[in-house]
Amino acid sequence: TTLFRSDVILEVLRKYKEQGREFETVCCIYSTAPFVTPERLREAYGKMNSEIDSVFTCVAYSYPIQRSLHIVDGKISMVYPEYKNARSQDLEPIYHDAGQFYFSRTAPFVESRTFWGENTAGLVLSELEVQDLDTQTDWALAEMKYELLHK
């Protein structure tokens, strides 16, 4: 059986509720996120209000995905050919989940069973603050970014 992040957090919240403890907010921090800081956690927490139920970290793709390519049967072509002549600096930034942490007001989280509801905001990070850790190369990049951040 695969347990998802939300299932685990819902179970923890249920166990605490059984013990008479309830929380207004919940935060999930990934153990593989080496650049999480107290300042960024406070910043994300501060974004939640009457209109925002959840906040998670995101980062812009390093190159516009509008100019992305795919290879089919050995031939390369643009995914979005309408952007063939567009300058990369003129294209809208597109973001992806940075996989660091997720904040939510507890009641909407329990109701929707997700950190990503319709009232979710993103906390945009710089590329220096984000590094996936799946390979040895990823680890080496994280070390280099750490050095740059702490000069």
Please tell me what each predicted stretch does.
Residues D7, I94-K151:
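Conserved alpha/beta core of the MobA/IspD/sugar-nucleotide pyrophosphorylase nucleotidyltransferase superfamily
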Residues G74-P93:
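Short, flexible, basic/aromatic active-site loop/helix in glycosyltransferases
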Residues P38-I65, V72-K75:
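Basic phosphate/pyrophosphate-binding loop/patch that engages nucleotide-derived ligands
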Residues R14-G20:
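Phosphate/pyrophosphate-binding loops at sites that engage ATP/ADP/AMP, CoA/4′-phosphopantetheine
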Residues T32, S54-T57, R105, T135:
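Generic structural signal for small/hydrophobic residues in well-ordered secondary structure
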Residues D7-V12, R40-E43, K47, L141:
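Alpha-helical elements of Rossmann-like donor-binding domains used by nucleotide-donor carbohydrate transfer enzymes
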Residues T2-L3:
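Short, small-residue-biased leader/transition segments that mark boundaries at the very start
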Residues R21-T32:
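Short beta-strand-to-loop acidic/aromatic patch adjacent to the donor-nucleotide binding site
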